[in-house]
């Protein structure tokens, strides 16, 4: 296995859907399938927060969602659970600044995809040095999807990272919608990452398709 190429990583970040069982009143597998039909390009299993599954139940759901992703050829990333990622042979792991050290995670997962959350230039540079394949940057806009979300920074944080010489793929997160996706891509993001914009939508398929079209339009300018 070899590390994912930067160009492929950028393409995969176009529409990055994050969810767990706690993010929708509907079964997670139903929501994910519709989102995949709509054009999601990367998926992160984030089973955290009040009511989140644990142990065998968490692993069973992870495997179910992973099978869906494989059927669509979409990489399956696990949030902050290296042991689970290794147990099910996930495609990668994403860690935040308060999770396990990124350098240690890289050592454990080998060449699997490693994503790291960053909120400023210093954190971004440290993540690059630790071996991150992409950065999750935000929150760009106010969000209620994450109980521990920091203050929104606006698209300018993306410009600051690019101006500081950060060249690895970046996905923007936090309050992203089809209406503002163009703005964040133009500011320096390679794609958008969402939870509620898809998970809470009346039609996850239509929501994913709208995001995909917005990112595509911004990229081709």
UniProtKB/Swiss-Prot annotation:
Q: Which GO terms describe its molecular function?
A: magnesium ion binding; thiamine-phosphate diphosphorylase activity
- List UniProt keywords, sorted A-Z: Magnesium, Metal-binding, Thiamine biosynthesis, Transferase
**Catalyzed reaction equations:** 2-[(2R,5Z)-2-carboxy-4-methylthiazol-5(2H)-ylidene]ethyl phosphate + 4-amino-2-methyl-5-(diphosphooxymethyl)pyrimidine + 2 H(+) = thiamine phosphate + CO2 + diphosphate; 2-(2-carboxy-4-methylthiazol-5-yl)ethyl phosphate + 4-amino-2-methyl-5-(diphosphooxymethyl)pyrimidine + 2 H(+) = thiamine phosphate + CO2 + diphosphate; 4-methyl-5-(2-phosphooxyethyl)-thiazole + 4-amino-2-methyl-5-(diphosphooxymethyl)pyrimidine + H(+) = thiamine phosphate + diphosphate
Q: So where does 4-amino-2-methyl-5-(diphosphooxymethyl)pyrimidine get bound?
A: 44-48, 79, 117, 146
Give its E.C. classification number.
2.5.1.3
The record's top EC class is transferase
- InterPro entries given for it? Aldolase_TIM, ThiamineP_synth_sf, ThiamineP_synth_TenI, TMP_synthase
GO terms for CC?
cytoplasm
| Co-factor: note | Binds 1 Mg(2+) ion per subunit.
Give me the residues that bind Mg(2+), please.
80, 99
- Asked if the keyword Transferase belongs to this entry, the reply reads yes
Q: Does Transferase count among this protein's keywords?
A: yes
Write out the residues that bind 2-[(2R,5Z)-2-carboxy-4-methylthiazol-5(2H)-ylidene]ethyl phosphate.
143-145, 175, 195-196
Name the cofactor(s) required for activity, per the record.
Mg(2+)
What pathway or pathways are given for this protein in its record? Cofactor biosynthesis; thiamine diphosphate biosynthesis; thiamine phosphate from 4-amino-2-methyl-5-diphosphomethylpyrimidine and 4-methyl-5-(2-phosphoethyl)-thiazole: step 1/1
State the family named in the UniProt similarity comment for this chain. Answer: Belongs to the thiamine-phosphate synthase family.
Role noted for this protein: Condenses 4-methyl-5-(beta-hydroxyethyl)thiazole monophosphate (THZ-P) and 2-methyl-4-amino-5-hydroxymethyl pyrimidine pyrophosphate (HMP-PP) to form thiamine monophosphate (TMP).
State the name under which the record lists this protein.
Thiamine-phosphate synthase
Whose protein is this, by species?
A: Geobacillus kaustophilus (strain HTA426)
